[in-house]
Amino acid sequence: MNIHEYQAKQILKRFGISVPEGVIVHSLNEVNDAINKINSKVIVVKAQIHAGGRGKAGGVIVSRTLDEAKTAIKNMLGSTLVTHQTSKDGQKVRKVYLEEGCDIKKEYYISAIVNRKHGQISIIFSTEGGVDIEEVAANSPEKVVTCNIDPIFGFQGFHGRNLCFDSNLSVDQTRKITSIAKKIYKTMLETDASQIEINPLIETSSGDFIALDAKMNFDDNAIYRHPEILELRDYDEEIPEEIEASKHGLSYIKMDGNIGCMVNGAGLAMATMDIIKYYGAEPANFLDVGGGASQQTVTEAFKIILSDNVDGILVNIFGGIMRCDIIANGIIAAIQEIGINVPLVVRLSGTNFELGKKLLDNSKLNIITAHDLSEAAYDIVNIVKK
C-alpha cells in the first residue's frame, strides 16, 4: 500500500526525523487559510500523487510571493500530471501540499528496503541526492552505498559509519546521518513498511538534516496490524480494477496490453504474460485467482478483465489443489451469467484436466481449448490480430 508524501512525513516526524512544516490543500477554498499557516517567505507547492518524478514534470513549484503560490495551486489542483512513473494518461492531482521553503546547502539520498534475497533490511545512502538519483545509481554506482542490517542484532552505530565511510563527511555529519538511518530502520520495523525513501535528505547551512521529500509503502500482508496506517489509503490514487479484485481475494495488476489473462499462481501468471509477449502481443493484466477459486471467484475475475475493454482472454489453469473440472464448470457458469463477446482460449492441465476440457468442448459456448500453454498463447494472439 502506498501513501502520499505528506502522510509519509507525518509518520517520519513521529519517529523523530525532521521535516518541513506544511499544510495539505484539497480545494481552492482552503488556499488562503493554508498559506497563512506557513511562516515562510518561500512556499513550495507540491502535487500529491502516488508517483515519483514530480519535480521534472512540473509537480513541484517554488513560490516566492503569495500570488505565485496561489497561481501555482490554482493551476495544479485538478490538473493531470504525467511523469516517468505514471501511465501515458498521467494522474489527476486531487490535493497539493504547501510547505515552507528550506535553506539547502547539500542534498543527500537515504532509503530502506526489504532485501528479500538476504532476509534483511537494507539501508541505502548517497551523497548525491536529488531528482537525478537514478542517473547517479546507473552511471556512478560507487557513490551509492548499501548496508544490510542483521535483524538479530538490529541497527548498530557501525552501520551508520559504514554508510558514510567513503563520503568525506565530518564526524558531526556522520553522527547525524547515523541517527537518521537508525530512526528509518526503527520506522520500518514498527510500521511493517516495505520501503522508506527520503530524497532529498537536505543539510541546511546551520547543519540540520531535514527530509525534504519522502516516500513510503507498506506490506499489504501486514497492514491489518496497523489500522491507523490503513486509514491513510487513498482509493482515488488506485486503479479501480485492482481495488475490486482485492475485495474478492484476487491478485490483479493492470497493464497496457489488450489480451486479458486469468491464471492460478503468480509464477504461472508471469510465464503466461511472457509467452503472450513472445508471440508478439501484450498482456492487459496480471490476474491470479489463487489455489481455491470458486465459481463466484471466476465470475468476478471475468468481470474485472472485461471492464478493461480487452480484445481477447487467455485462461491458463494448472489443477493441483484445484480440480480442472470444477474450474471448467466455473468458466461455463460465468460466461452464461455475464456473457463474453471477445475470443476466449482456455488451457487446462493437472487434476481432471481431460474432464474439464470435455466440459468446455461440449458446452456449445464460444470457447477454444488448447493442449498446452504455447498453443493457447499462439491461438489467442493470432485470433486477436485478425
From Swiss-Prot:
GO cellular component: cytosol; succinate-CoA ligase complex
Metabolic or biological pathway, per its Swiss-Prot or TrEMBL entry: Carbohydrate metabolism; tricarboxylic acid cycle; succinate from succinyl-CoA (ligase route): step 1/1
UniProt binding sites for substrate: N264, G320, I321, M322
SUPFAM superfamilies on file: Glutathione synthetase ATP-binding domain-like, Succinyl-CoA synthetase domains
Cofactor mode of binding and number, as noted: Binds 1 Mg(2+) ion per subunit.
GO molecular function, one term: magnesium ion binding
Residues that coordinate or bind ATP: K46, G53, R54, G55, E99, C102, E107
EC number: 6.2.1.5
Keywords assigned by UniProt, alphabetized: ATP-binding, Ligase, Magnesium, Metal-binding, Nucleotide-binding, Tricarboxylic acid cycle
Domain of life of the native organism: Bacteria
Catalytic activity: succinate + ATP + CoA = succinyl-CoA + ADP + phosphate; GTP + succinate + CoA = succinyl-CoA + GDP + phosphate
NCBIfam families the UniProt entry points to: PRK00696.1, sucCoAbeta
Family recorded in the similarity comment: Belongs to the succinate/malate CoA ligase beta subunit family.
Protein name: Succinate--CoA ligase [ADP-forming] subunit beta
Taxonomic lineage: Bacteria, Pseudomonadati, Pseudomonadota, Alphaproteobacteria, Rickettsiales
